[in-house]
A protein has these predicted regions:
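Glycine-rich beta-solenoid repeat tracts in large extracellular/virion proteins
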Residues: 1, 12-20, 32-43, 57-65, ...
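Right-handed parallel beta-helix
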Residues: 1-7, 23-32, 47-55
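Polar/charged side chains located within well-ordered beta-strands of beta-rich proteins
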Residues: 2, 27, 49-51, 272, ...
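Primarily extracellular Gram-negative trimeric autotransporter adhesin
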Residues: 32, 56-67, 141-193, 389-408, ...
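Extracellular, surface-exposed repeat/solenoid domains
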Residues: 61-153
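Outer membrane beta-barrel translocator domains of Type V secretion systems
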Residues: 155-321, 325, 438-439, 443-445, ...
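Solvent-exposed, glycine/polar-rich loop segments of beta-barrel outer-membrane systems
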Residues: 242, 246-248, 282-302, 337-358, ...
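Outer membrane beta-barrel transmembrane domains
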Residues: 258-259, 352-460
Length: 460
């Protein structure tokens, strides 16, 4: 290895290697003689030659008694004006050209990097990639070659890897939308006075793991007692904060909204009960792909909306004196859709097809309310969700040749437990404070979610 200066310009002789073989010879400095710079005697050969000398001085000149080229020749590049040049006199054999792994490259033309070699002197391709660049040896004339580097653009393999990571983060967003939408079907306002009106104000906090995300919202619920056996209502759930997985941003602009209706067999709530409810959520969603290798940090804006519809049949009865038990069975249809979009801010943007998850599920379990005191109650539920039908699109993107769609529904859980526990406290006959925590398994990638909800209810 030579990293300094060897100057034999006044000696009249070249630098001579006379015996043995050289595995790797690296010249990061300068060697200069009157005649050929380096002379190899007899059959002595070099396995790998790495060279930085040339552009900022004279080219590294080689001659050999057998004229045998090194097995591998790697140019060392420090900048567009500082790189290796090789001048080989009357060569025989062949060499494989490459770029030294420690080089600092930029797009452009590196002139006369090799002189003295014909096309037949090269083994293998005279083009390739180095980092995020493509390179090609350009035969500008005779036996003179320029090296041309240009940005290679994102490779299909690296883009596929970044797409797989985006799919994982988007599954987290779909899980979050599913958790929030399904929990909203439990919103109710059932405390009435002489006017048959009810209003509830509260706050919701939801969290999802794998990948981690959370959101909080202010919730307003209204109820109206149509008759002793029928009541209706609606709600608004306005997000105030969203902490989404990396590369995902969900806006707080649009509230989730929904409506519900109950029919009870008896005015006191015992016996059969039929409930129908729906919820609608529409959010602006922004994505940024992770950079993996040559892939680009593509940005995109789209919308994420979910719709859920629930029909529930239950039967309430008293167990002993202080406990109300309500077994239930329900059917729920949920649709979560991300609109199609095209990335911006990159040289090779990806275009994504719409992504939709449609699920019909059966829900069964039991709810209870246990009177702790005349004013305080313990409430809770235990149940299971079973998917009856599910259709999930694949995450499909185009824009880079060779991409394949990602299986968005991989590791999907079709049977999911759900449980809740909470308490209510009647401040007065027409005022109630309540809190509840619900925990459930979510559909995508072995994920659990939890929601805490606290509200203050007033009856009129």
């Amino acid at each position: 290895m030579n990293s300094g200066t060897i100057d034999g310009s006044t000696s009249g002789y070249p630098l001579r290697f006379t015996s043995g073989s050289i595995g790797t010879f690296t010249n990061s400095g300068s060697i200069s003689y009157v005649f050929s710079t380096i002379l190899l005697d007899g059959s002595l050969t070099i396995g790998t030659l790495n060279n930085a000398q040339g552009a900022s001085s004279s080219a590294l000149k080689f001659s050999a008694s057998s004229k045998t080229l090194p097995t591998n020749y790697n140019i060392i590049i420090n900048s567009l004006s500082d790189f290796g040049r090789l001048d080989w006199t009357s060569p025989s054999g062949s060499t494989t050209f490459g770029i030294y792994s420690g080089s600092t490259v930029a797009a452009g033309r590196y002139t006369s990097v090799i002189t003295g070699l014909s096309a037949g002197s090269f083994t293998g391709a005279r083009s390739g990639t180095y980092g995020s660049y493509s390179w090609v040896l350009d035969n500008v004339s005779g036996t003179t070659w320029d090296l041309v580097l240009s940005l290679a653009g994102p490779s299909a393999a690296d883009t596929q890897s970044s797409l797989a990571r985006l799919a994982s983060n988007l599954r987290g967003s779909f899980n979050s939308a599913s958790l929030i939408s399904n929990f909203s079907n439990t919103y109710d306002c059932n405390l009435f006075d002489v006017k048959g009106m009810c209003i509830s104000a509260g706050g919701r906090y939801s969290t999802v793991d794998n990948p981690s995300s959370n959101s909080s919202a202010a919730v307003v619920t209204l109820g109206y007692k149509v008759s002793p056996n029928i009541r209706i209502g609606g709600f608004l759930d306005q997000s105030v904060n969203n902490n989404s997985p990396a590369g995902i941003d969900i806006s707080n602009k649009h509230p989730m909204m929904g409506a519900f209706a109950y029919w009870n067999q008896n005015a006191d709530g015992l016996g059969y009960q039929v409930k129908v409810a729906n919820a609608y959520l529409d959010k602006d969603l922004s994505t940024i792909r992770d950079v993996i290798g040559t892939s680009e940090a593509g940005r995109g804006n789209t919308s994420l909306n979910s719709r859920s519809y629930v029909s529930e049949l239950s039967y309430a009865f008293m167990y002993k004196e202080n406990t109300l038990v309500r077994p239930y069975f329900a059917l729920r249809h949920t649709s979560i859709e991300q609109d199609a979009y095209t990335e911006t801010g990159v040289t090779t943007p990806l275009t994504y097809s719409a992504l939709n998850d449609r699920t019909t599920s059966a829900l069964m379990g039991v709810k209870f309310k246990h009177a702790l005191t005349p004013k305080a109650n313990l409430i809770g539920s235990l149940g299971v969700e079973q998917d009856l039908n599910n259709k999930t699109d694949r995450l499909t993107a185009s824009g880079v040749s060779g991409l394949t769609s990602e299986n968005f529904s991989g590791n999907l859980y079709h049977t999911r437990p759900v449980a809740s526990l909470g308490a209510t406290y009647d401040i007065t006959k027409t005022q109630r404070l309540a809190g509840e925590v619900l925990v459930q398994q979510l559909p995508f990638q072995s994920t659990a979610g939890a929601t805490a909800y606290v509200n203050y209810m007033i009856g009129f």
